[in-house]
Each structure stands twice: as structure tokens, then as C-alpha cells.
Amino acid sequence: MLKKIVTALGMSGMLLASSNAIAEDTTTKNDNLSPQSVDLSPLRNLNKLDSPMDKDYNYHQAFKKLDTEQLKKDMQDLLTQSQDWWPADFGNYGPFFIRLSWHDAGTYRIYDGRGGANRGQQRFSPLNSWPDNVNLDKARQLLWPIKQKYGDAVSWSDLIVLAGTVSLESMGMKPIGFAFGREDDWQGDDTNWGLSPEEIMSSNVRDGKLAPAYAATQMGLIYVNPEGPDGKPDIKGAASEIRQAFRAMGMTDKETVALIAGGHTFGKTHGAVPEDKVKQTIGPAPDKAPIEQQGLGWHNSYGTGNGDDTMGSGLEGSWTSTPTFWNHDFLHNLYNLDWKKTLSPAGAHQWTPTNAKPENMVPDAHKPGVKHKPIMFTTDLALKEDDGFNKYTQEFYNNPEEFKEEFAKAWFKLTHRDMGPKSRYIGPWIPEQNFIWQDPVPAADYKQVSTQDIAQLEQDIINSGLTNQQLIKTAWDSASTYRKTDYRGGSNGARIALAPEKDWQMNEPAKLEVVLTKLKEIQTNFNNSKTDGTKVSLADLIVLGGNVGVEQAAKQAGYNIQMPFVPGRTDATQAQTDIESFNYLKTKSDGFINYTDGSVSADKLPQTLVEKASMLDLNIPEMTVLVGGMRALDVNYDNSQEGVLTTTPGQLNNSFFVNLLDMSTQWKKSDKKDGEYIGIDRKTGKQKWTASPVDLIFGSNSELKAVAQVYAENGNEQKFVNDFAKAWHKVMMLGRFDVQQ
């Protein structure tokens, strides 16, 4: 069966884009780990170690020497320079490069921010060998002469997305802009890709539903099967899967329709090899290809192996009679032709018209004068038959200019969503328009606070009556929303004062309101007192308040520290905040404050701590010192005393590690509360402490214990405080792309 050879995937259609996501409680497969173990690999930045670039290499600086207009011209020239080793369909590589960009950017996951075009993961296994990325190895190879010419001045990540964007413009679809700024990885991302094709194709495993953490129907599949669910031409089922999959990357129904209809305006699919010859003629993917193929996979021994004999998804044909020009013929054909189910030469389910007229016929991609009937996927017909999608296909069909505009906006979102805020964009083609999915914050139209102002505000905070714990917890809750995967969240914007963050359980809304009310009062009084245009934002005050809390707690423990503070954060408005989108930043558990919403089993809590630390771009020592400090500071969620292993709660000292590693305490599971452990004095048998699995992992895991022992050693008390302060400042600065760090 074709499905067993190429897993029934529609690899040429622009509908398809891959899933690079994983549930929030794990980033890698932990099948070989015992329940007591924790996988620390997400905290190791091996990409920096594996990078061949000089240590002082800075992409933003290297980019300054790039001639972007010449790069664009070279890209435009490449589109029509057909190569014998991989001839261009219709003499134009544009549709091929659009698919390349789409499949690269389309891996984005809104659930955890993983995937997307940033970092160029499509170059590495497993993405480079996913069945749905068949033959895209050739597209990247076609780009190599351009990458070789411009070298370090342009990343692969930027080049791959630029290729699709320039292709669109060359074929009559003017994009709204393009931003450079994506940086390359140097190894494949060790991500949990979901169930295997064999598991997921079984109806008793998938039951017609997409796993929300992955969105794709199976590993290696880009979103949905174009033939229909499980390769069955079920239009209604296809519509349901399309909606779930595109929503999982943050797309609305309108954006979904624009992207699919616009993408399928161009190019063709490839299924020329007869079904009974596929197995013996199509070679393995790049990661299993013979060494002499030099990283190129899916060798095709049928006919010429390319051109009209190309084998890709198994579906065969084009959607429109003008596959290298932008128009709305896809929608015209969708509504004006009668579609009949048929099979491609490779045996894949597709649809052809029964009433095609000469003007509807599609030119052959390589043989002049030869014509074919247009095709549709099962998933294409879903755009007409589903009521929600039909609304927009009708709207776009009747309003071609609106269709063009909406596709341009959706394409920009698709290819830039994982880049984070607009402050990360570089280059000359950045659109002036702001979009809510960029999580915009207003530019400061006032003078920033001076050193003297900061000292005054610190004293105002100290005199406010707010406790150190209140200040520290609020600052943490604000800043720790950051995700390094897609650069969202963080303290900038003060969105902890807005919906939905202000109402999250972990932020303890009633307590949060008390703190915010007092800080807003300080802000108002200060701003009203200044006559020189100086102002302070609530976002800055929240962070400054946390700093004050840390400094005061250290002082109470006998240590004088000066927390660094960099003003410049501004306050977002509710209108600038997409509630649904921001709810994806809500964490199921935060081990730094011993919080869980109850959905994560106790034995998985240590791993979710690692996941949280990874999202905050922390390494192992930083995670360790922060947990130890937060426990000593007594800032657990709901005033929980689990892990507060100190007789001086609220003071910043190393008592958590000292007491955790003290052998006079014996730890036992609680018989009253799942996931709670009781620390008992070995001599008296009396209870001394309680702890969570997150706390005890620092004495159980050998690597974490080694770090914990450093902080528990005599003579390292000051080191602990200093390291905590550095790690705290790092978290507070996450998302501050407006400043050079």
C-alpha cells in the first residue's frame, strides 16, 4: 500500500506544515528513565558547544554587511534557472520554495512555542527526513550557491523563509514585508514528536482526534492527511482535522482558508510513480540514504527520477491553469467545477472535475502542449463543504482583493510568528503595521527614571507596607511567563495586571490585586510629582519591587547586595493583549514556587520543573540556585510550607540545601497527601519538614545533588546569594529585546 511507503502524506500541498510540539510536562522522550529520574538535557545548550562559529560571532552584526537588494535579485534569478539534476516544474522554482518555507515555518506550536522557521531545524534529522518533507532536501540544495555566496551574513533560517517570500512576490503576490533575524541551530532538536505512524494510523489509538500537544495526526505528518483522515476521503472529517491543526498553531478559520487557498494557487503535487512500483523505486529519506548521495534522500529510479517522473506525496496534479501566477482560480475551480473522487497514478485519493472546460485545463509541468485536468485534495473540498470555512471561501471568491490582502497577512504571520516581538526584527523590509499576535507593547513616550529616581522608588516600595514575599512572588509571576521557544511572555508589558494573567490561579488573584493596587498608587504619585517628563511604568515597578524584596531578604540574612535594574519596560493595554493566545503561556506547574494545577502527576513534577527552567533559558546551576533561594524566601504558592527547609523563612540564605542534605533527617512518603514527603528527625522521630518531589530531586538526582552540595558547603554562603541574584536578574530581563544584553 502507498500509505505504508510514504505514510499517505500530501507533501507537495501548501496545506501541510509540520508539528514540532510537545506537552508542557516534557521536552524529550524519557522512556528509559525510572520514575525517580529526571532528564536534564533541556538545560544543556549544546548548540553553543556544537557551533562552528567564532565565539564572538554575532548574527545581527554580521547581517549589517549583507546587500539585501542583491540577495533578493539573486533569489529572483534562481527561480527560473532550472537545473538538470532537479528540473523546475513549469520552469519556475517559486512554488517549490513556497512549500519549503511553509513546511519550515509551519512546524510552529502555539501550545509550547516550539517549532517554526527560527533556528533552521528543517536542515536536521528528523525534520529533514519526515515523509511530509519529501524532496525539500533538493530545495535547500538549490539555495546552497546563494548561502555560499553570502556566507555568515545571512542565516539558513532567514534564507529558507526569504525564498518563499521572494517567490510569492515574483509570481504576483506582493507580501506585506519580511524580517530578518532568525539564527541557526547546529544540531537537531531532541523533541518528542508524538506517536509513530503505525500507532497513530490505528483508529483505536487516534480515534479521529488530534493530540493537542502535537496537532499533527502522526509523527512525520504535516498537520493533516490531504487524502482525508487515515487516508480516507472523508470531507467532513478532514474539515475537523484542519480546524484543530491550524488552531494549534494560532490560526483562525479566516487565516486557515487564506493560507490553504492561497498556497494551492501555485505549483503541483507529485505522484507519478505507479502504486505497484513505489516500493522498489523510491529510496530512503536523507537520514537513511547511502553515504554517496551526500545528504539527499528519496532517490527515485523510476524513469528519469525527476521532472514528470517525480514522486512526492503520491497525489498528482495542479489546482489551477496558471500554477506560477497569483489569482483566485483555486476558488473559482472549487465552486464552479463538479468534483469526482479518483486515484492518482500512485494510488492516492484525490478529486478531478467532471465538467472541466478547455480554460480550466492545467499545463504539464515539463511537456509543452500537454494538458491535464486540475485536481483538488479532500482537504481542499472541506473548505467548501464546512460551514465555517465556506463563509470565508465565498467571501474571498467574491472579493479577490480581500483574498490577496488576507493571504499576505496570514503568510507574514505564518513565517514570523515564532520570532517573538517586533523588537527582534532586523532588515529593511519590516512592515510598519503592528499585529496583536506580535504581543505589542507601546513605545515609551517619556523620560526614563534616573539613578536618583530609582532610589526614591525603592524607598517608596519599602515604605508601602508590602512584604518581601508579596513583592518577590509578584515579580516572579510576571517575568516567569517567558518562553524561549517563541520569545513570548516576560515582564515587559506588565500583562500580569491584565486579563487573562491577572486571573490565573497560580497568580493568586486576590493577593495579586493587593500588590498591584499599591504599586499603581506609587506609580501615580511618582509620575504626578515629576515635571520633567520622567515616568515609571508599572512593568518596571513590579520588577523593581522584586529586587527590593530580594535585597531586603538578603540584608536580613546578613548579606548586602545591590540588584541591577534596567528601566525601560512599558505597559501594554488590554486591547494589545490576545486573551486566548496568552492563555497558552499559563503553566500547569511551576516548581520554583511549588505550584501545580493538579493535572500533572506527582512523579512528573520534577520534569516539569526542568521544562519550566528550559523555557526560562536557565542552565542547571541557575535552576538549582533559584529553587533553593525561593524556598528560603518562603514564596511558595498559597503559602505552602513544602520545601521551606529553614528556621528563618523569608531570609535569603542557603538553608534549603544545608537542611536537604542533612543526614539527621529521614524522608518518607506522606500517607495523607499524594506527592508530599515528610522529613523526620532520625533520633526523635518527630516531623521537621515537608517537601515536594521537586524539592527532593535536588538530593536524589546525582547531577543536581552535586550542584546542591556546592551551595551547602561552608564558605559558599555568599556565593549562593550572589548566584541567586544573578539568576534572578536574568529572569527579570527575559524578553528585554529592546536593550543590548
Swiss-Prot record:
UniProt protein name: Catalase-peroxidase
Active site: residue positions: 103
Oligomeric form and interacting partners: Homodimer or homotetramer.
Phylogenetic classification of the source organism: Bacteria, Pseudomonadati, Pseudomonadota, Gammaproteobacteria, Thiotrichales
One GO MF term: metal ion binding
Cofactor(s) the record lists: heme b
EC number: 1.11.1.21
UniProt cross-link Tryptophyl-tyrosyl-methioninium (Trp-Tyr) (with M-249), position: 102-223
